Amino acid sequence: MLSKLLRLGEGRMVKRLKKVADYVGTLSDDVEKLTDAELRAKTDEFKRRLADQKNPETLDDLLPEAFAVAREAAWRVLDQRPFDVQVMGAAALHLGNVAEMKTGEGKTLTCVLPAYLNALAGNGVHIVTVNDYLAKRDSEWMGRVHRFLGLQVGVILATMTPDERRVAYNADITYGTNNEFGFDYLRDNMAHSLDDLVQRGHHYAIVDEVDSILIDEARTPLIISGPADGASNWYTEFARLAPLMEKDVHYEVDLRKRTVGVHEKGVEFVEDQLGIDNLYEAANSPLVSYLNNALKAKELFSRDKDYIVRDGEVLIVDEFTGRVLIGRRYNEGMHQAIEAKEHVEIKAENQTLATITLQNYFRLYDKLAGMTGTAQTEAAELHEIYKLGVVSIPTNMPMIREDQSDLIYKTEEAKYIAVVDDVAERYAKGQPVLIGTTSVERSEYLSRQFTKRRIPHNVLNAKYHEQEATIIAVAGRRGGVTVATNMAGRGTDIVLGGNVDFLTDQRLRERGLDPVETPEEYEAAWHSELPIVKEEASKEAKEVIEAGGLYVLGTERHESRRIDNQLRGRSGRQGDPGESRFYLSLGDELMRRFNGAALETLLTRLNLPDDVPIEAKMVTRAIKSAQTQVEQQNFEVRKNVLKYDEVMNQQRKVIYAERRRILEGENLKDQALDMVRDVITAYVDGATGEGYAEDWDLDALWTALKTLYPVGITADSLTRKDHEFERDDLTREELLEALLKDAERAYAAREAELEEIAGEGAMRQLERNVLLNVIDRKWREHLYEMDYLKEGIGLRAMAQRDPLVEYQREGYDMFMAMLDGMKEESVGFLFNVTVEAVPAPPVAPAAEPAELAEFAAAAAAAAQQRSAVDGGARERAPSALRAKGVASESPALTYSGPAEDGSAQVQRNGGGAHKTPAGVPAGASRRERREAARRQGRGAKPPKSVKKR
């Protein structure tokens, strides 16, 4: 319903865009008369008109002229003139919409116009692609147009240094992947100097394949992590146990929810294997996460589908695009469990240093736009989360592709036999075929079948993605057979007869020419070589059209309709003929997860042979229903991720804003002194409370204060008069005033001391280093504790409480406690850290000086003393300035190596025998003791693992 409501004004928007395109067209004659130099000079003219103080123009005012200039430049440089529908798409992008343009309609060229227009403002434009190859290709290819018009173009690649990134971001237009933009944002907020920053703001972004990045990728947060302690031997031990456990006997699996649940027999089996009495006892509870991960690795993560193993390393495969996600790792120990399952090196677990979801990263931009061939199915989500409207841009030529109905077979074997027969028939008549699969395993199986039938073919999957552009560029040639995993975001059009631009570029590169390194020679050779390639490709394209155009064959329905539509959309581009069909079986994952039993019953009643397919509306409805259910589930997951991350997002904004103030502040003395006052005020409040002066324990207060700074006054000097106690005369305000003056005196003395040791400005440098180190360390600890809070917050629903509300409330309390802890530790470090006048290496973002660590230990010890100052009130109210942590209640577990029978032995550091829960007889059974432990809620904090970057 919401999608329909959102489309009500679409017709008016399309008419508005059509008027813009028509007006741009009326300017073409005047622009065509300009020389190259005059056309290039238009850029400076536009910039002057924007900056005019008396009569400034807006980007909207310049749109028609700027679009006309960019359109003419594209024609002169690329021999490609954007069609009117592309100008309409460009206008939609400038207005901050998602332009839905079918495959082959020229989204890459469309992007040139709004990028040029918005770059005139001088704030930078980010063009976001799905991989490094497309970012580099588009920056070179479309960058030729921008450079012709006098703009600078940069590209962000994974291998670049910070200096190279900074140069790229300072360009007028910057290409890069969503991951690189996001990680650079996180790294900038871990920098210890303004000189280390690379980005310069978030003003305007155009996201290519916007549905893939903003929808599919939204469930996966970007995480920068560092090493953490972990017990890799437990992963190995549970990888040994998992194959010994039987499904539906020891555990159950829910494929729809992608969860596993351990039965009572499974728990007893594990306890017997490990030689422990109670798996759910506090000391053993970390083992539960190892068990769950091992079972998930066994049942829910398949090799050559969800991941591949290359050179002894487990690499994740993107379920939507089929690409390898280099540098990505599953979190919560899942990646280590898979490594143990595959018997490869188990890499250390990691701790989160910085994180953000793509949803919240892209909401940083002042203006956001996107392009894709399939957006209407996700229009409601794009509007709800990103406030983006979706505009369907008409095709330049009518679509004449024939989409055949699905064929459903009883078995996978029968389905693949039919697929190979169909492809062989098409190959024989010279028709190019694109076969879409959902996994690496399936693509390689089909490849073997084609080899047996002696059908030449190319395979494009996660193992061969480096050859992606070459394979796709020739996939439309006569007799071409291409087996590929999911085609989402491939970026290179399948052109009948071959991709002319790609083939021309390939020939020029073979001659040693490069559009960036040798631009003049490249441009000259391009214009001479292009007509030759065009003629060759045109002749072959006619033969392909006579054979029926590109035939797209899907071997399985994806859980997302968009992915199916994107696969189909590879055929029938620009009015070309084409055909598509999906071959399905009851063994397909989607069919098994939803309504598979009903379909199997239908086929059984029809009594059809395995090799005879059916075509029925019931099947089509069942598939659509299944896909809709999955899409709705995924939408709910993404909304839930966003709701919880919104809590962290507000906290992240506060911390990052504070870091930036520290980085930019030339003199942090006032801020440091404010912290000193806040900390001492909190200490005094905790010591005085609401009682009378004679009830105050000033000795405990002084003991606590001495852990922070060298106190120069004594309690006696305030409370004694003529050697007699006069506590009734001392007020809380007098006590606080005296201590604040003393602290300011001590701070001035500390500054003089440092200047004598290290010269002028030493205290200012120490302030910056201390504040940055403390804020980074406390934020890192806070991320860990917030993750831990979120892991168990769902259990609050059992107490009739809203988990999200509880997460918001407790997260706020923890955040405020962290801010108080930052102040307290910063003050202690400023007064106590040792400073020497020797050159020091740059401080790494996650590093912490040894002196700070030593003081942190001392401060922790002093915290216990301070808790007695107010008779334990600090334990009840977290308003005092100290960090609030979530500590494990159980001894640490270590791995002592396997016993003679190969089982793992549990040792407890400093622990003894298992303790029987209170209220349980000594002779109680294992099950009774375990249930008692569960009821008492005795649980320990499980080991934490995060994604690695």
From Swiss-Prot:
A GO MF label: ATP binding
InterPro entries for this protein: Helicase_ATP-bd, Helicase_C-like, P-loop_NTPase, SecA, SecA_CS, SecA_DEAD, SecA_motor_DEAD, SecA_preprotein_X-link_dom
GO BP, sorted A to Z: intracellular protein transmembrane transport; protein import; protein targeting; protein transport by the Sec complex
Stretches with biased composition (Basic and acidic residues): 925-934
SMART domains assigned to the protein according to its UniProt record, in alphabetical order: SecA_DEAD, SecA_PP_bind
Enzyme Commission no: 7.4.2.8
UniProt subcellular location: Cell membrane; Cytoplasm
Pfam families cross-referenced by the UniProt entry: P-loop_SecA (PF21090), SecA_DEAD (PF07517), SecA_PP_bind (PF01043), SecA_SW (PF07516)
Membrane topology (UniProt): Peripheral membrane protein
UniProt: ATP binding residues: 86, 104-108, 493
Membership in a protein family: Belongs to the SecA family.
UniProt protein name: Protein translocase subunit SecA 1
Provenance organism: Mycobacterium tuberculosis (strain ATCC 25618 / H37Rv)
